[in-house]
Amino acid sequence: MMAIAAAQLGYRCHVYEPGRDSVAAEVSAQFTCAPWHDEAALARFAESCDVVTWEFENVPVAPLAPIEGLLAPHPRALETAQDRLKEKRFVEGLGGVPAAYAPVDSAQDLAAAVDRIGAPGILKTRRDGYDGKGQWRIQTARDADAIRVPDAPTIYEGFVEFACEFSVILVRGRDGEVRFWDSAENTHVGGILATSTLPASAMVAEQVPAARDLAAQVAEALGYVGVLTLEFFATAEGPVFNEMAPRVHNSGHWTIEGAATSQFENHVRAICGLPLGDTATTAGQVVMTNIIGEDAQAAHECLGQPGAHLHLYGKRQARAGRKMGHVTRIGAG
């Protein structure tokens, strides 16, 4: 979707990815299939580019050092977002409020964390987990005794009593200008985003200003360029920070049809130094629904519905829990 947006602005995309079944490569001018740590391949790739960005935050940071001057956003955003502990401490330092947490490197650490923070809670790997992967729910202190703590560093997070979830998505230009899209209210099923709905509830609307203030501070502190997403829990005490994504985000896919300028186009505009586009919502009601796994087989049935816009990503295998596409439904409200 980003490559398509770039092409509409007259740019030719060159995709670098270790996997041969690259969906983005099918809509791009060039494709390099090579491991992340192949320095020669990465150097050749960089020689063909004026600017380099990413759409997946688990890209290894170390191999990017030789091409840092081409990167937007700066790789410090990746370094921060790739480690849940580092991310939470960073946000706390800016005045944000995350769930209660503690680093866990052993069974003893986990027992101490559960004793201090309480249960229920979630044990998460500090790196590489997304869409509910690398997570273990702990309902009681006794559950913690039965969990084999992974060899990789983990973090324990206390349960947050929340009414709903929402995202703050912004775009920041090279000149420091920041624009926000309206915040969608998000529903997750099994740790995977199911729907993003606008307008959000009154509770979300009340908490968006404080959440935006934090997101703007994060972008400023990182010297960020491009689209940045912060996810929040809406609670009785105010917005609680969940996690950040230094990239275009699934909860912003609705902007393709539902906003004056999509998150994908504005990301390209930002990293290329172009003026940012209008982020206003252009429909009275917007609902983005993810198409997960085998549901993709019946996805075309939605095309008979007024206001439905289908996006299938072209992924070859429909696995359980895999995002195969999305449909955005636009209404007058």
List the predicted regions and their residue ranges.
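ATP-binding N-terminal substructure of ATP-dependent carboxylate-amine bond-forming enzymes
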Residues: 1-89, 93, 108
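Short amphipathic alpha-helix with an adjacent loop that forms part of the alpha/beta core around
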Residues: 39-48, 111-116, 145-149
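A conserved helix-loop-beta module that forms one wall/lid of the active-site cleft
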Residues: 69-136, 141
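Short, flexible active-site loops
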Residues: 191-201, 243-256
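Active-site "cap" helix and flanking loop/linker of ATP-utilizing ligase/carboxylase catalytic domains
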Residues: 209-230, 235-236, 246-294
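Peripheral (often C-terminal) accessory segments that flank ATP-dependent C-N-forming ligase machineries
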Residues: 269-333
